[in-house]
């Protein structure tokens, strides 16, 4: 999965997919009542990027729905996975459940069109704080209450705080999550970061009793870093320049080992050689 980083304006969806992304990451900011408000990152952000592009969250969802609905004039067949980077750190811990409920309602209405031919992309809820695990339970309960528990088949999870992997496992246990787990590791492109924790996550993914299904590394701009991440065995790379990742994947060393994921590839299944 080549994951376009910080795609917060509708116009950027086409821009990133046309550069080779089959997945995008979108920032979601919340108001003080835990309503998802804008697709917005803010300053500071990655070096070399504009930090302030944004849309109202529900408006962005409507644009995203068009981009991921076959038959729509804006349909992008290659776009199969969306990571919502939930900026829930602005909330109190006891608001996490509400944030999950409100997020589910927004998606149900504006993206899934209440189960009536909405967007088809798989969705990852990426949460920065382990203490906010109730965001997941709130989200799940709401889809159930609203009569669409089947949409949870399209939803996966990530804790993005680079926490100790054992602690991440405990948070999932509290949230009642078994499966659909993506594990991120990374840092802003302005700073270097080694691959030690990525390798730990990959080892968990590949062990018989691991809880992780997929591992992604962020944010990668350089060919050398891309090669390092691929050599470590990641499933996804988040990038400001998706074409760089696509170029490396076409090199002879990688072309036979990796291919770009399509809609037919289940993002919740651990890849087995």
From Swiss-Prot:
Keyword Lipid biosynthesis in record: no
Active site: 5, 41 (nucleophile)
Reaction(s) catalysed by this chain's protein: an N-(acyl)-sphingosylphosphocholine = an N-(acyl)-sphingosyl-1,3-cyclic phosphate + choline; an N-(acyl)-sphingosylphosphoethanolamine = an N-(acyl)-sphingosyl-1,3-cyclic phosphate + ethanolamine; a 1-acyl-sn-glycero-3-phosphocholine = a 1-acyl-sn-glycero-2,3-cyclic phosphate + choline; a 1-acyl-sn-glycero-3-phosphoethanolamine = a 1-acyl-sn-glycero-2,3-cyclic phosphate + ethanolamine
KW Ubl conjugation (keyword) present: no
Keyword terms of this UniProt record: Cytolysis, Dermonecrotic toxin, Disulfide bond, Hemolysis, Lipid degradation, Lipid metabolism, Lyase, Magnesium, Metal-binding, Secreted, Toxin
Tissue specificity: Expressed by the venom gland.
Disulfide bond sites: 45-51, 47-190
CDD domains documented for this protein: GDPD_like_SMaseD_PLD
Function summary: Dermonecrotic toxins cleave the phosphodiester linkage between the phosphate and headgroup of certain phospholipids (sphingolipid and lysolipid substrates), forming an alcohol (often choline) and a cyclic phosphate. This toxin acts on sphingomyelin (SM). It may also act on ceramide phosphoethanolamine (CPE), lysophosphatidylcholine (LPC) and lysophosphatidylethanolamine (LPE), but not on lysophosphatidylserine (LPS), and lysophosphatidylglycerol (LPG). It acts by transphosphatidylation, releasing exclusively cyclic phosphate products as second products.
Similarity remark: Belongs to the arthropod phospholipase D family. Class II subfamily.
EC number in record: 4.6.1.-
Note on cofactor: Binds 1 Mg(2+) ion per subunit.
Predominant subcellular localization, coarse grouping: secreted
Gene Ontology terms: biological process: killing of cells of another organism; lipid catabolic process
Cofactor: Mg(2+)
Protein's UniProt name: Dermonecrotic toxin LdSicTox-alphaIB3aiii
Subcellular location field: Secreted
Residues involved in Mg(2+) binding: 25, 27, 85
